[in-house]
């Protein structure tokens, strides 16, 4: 089997309201999907991290930098492909966009392996360890509102997340130490002391 092409698909949708985190606010979200095609007709799908216009830069790296390096390679040789691309890109940085782009291709190669062997990914990476995977509810994004307004929004959203039987939740912070403390205390009070709560600043 050989890789015949790699395509990037940058998806974008407009948000109902502007949301943000400690670094910026945004009115739309993007997702960057990577499609690796083979001569056997098996197609692998991966995803690159890259919000906003970063997805466009990653698209360029996937299609114009990585694709020429791997056309004709056997997609089942995932580790060899990863090392080849990484070693040729590492002078451009060992983190950030080159690695984000490579990760999307790598995920697609795992998808191809799973489809070729008719195996779920968990079997390919060492076997099933758990019957259940805990998930958390995520929300409480920052908005351009006063802290008092955000407290009311966050309290309500936290209650909604908890009511959906999640075992934990994650909220955004990043307004500043005093403001963040007020938001966290309000959410903690609304969900109780025993419910797991995590914070993300970025």
Where are the regions that the model predicts?
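Structured beta-strand/loop patches that form or line metal/cofactor-binding pockets in enzymes
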Residues: 1-40, 45, 49-51
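Metal- or metallocofactor-binding catalytic centers and their adjacent structured scaffolds
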Residues: 37-116
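Conserved small/polar residues in nucleotide/adenosyl-binding loops
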Residues: 200-202
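Structural preference for beta-strand elements that scaffold enzyme active sites
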Residues: 134, 167-170, 194-198
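Alpha/beta enzyme core
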Residues: 152-167
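Active-site mouth loops of central-metabolism enzymes
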Residues: 134-153
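Active-site-adjacent beta->alpha loops and helix N-cap segments on the catalytic face
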Residues: 175-187
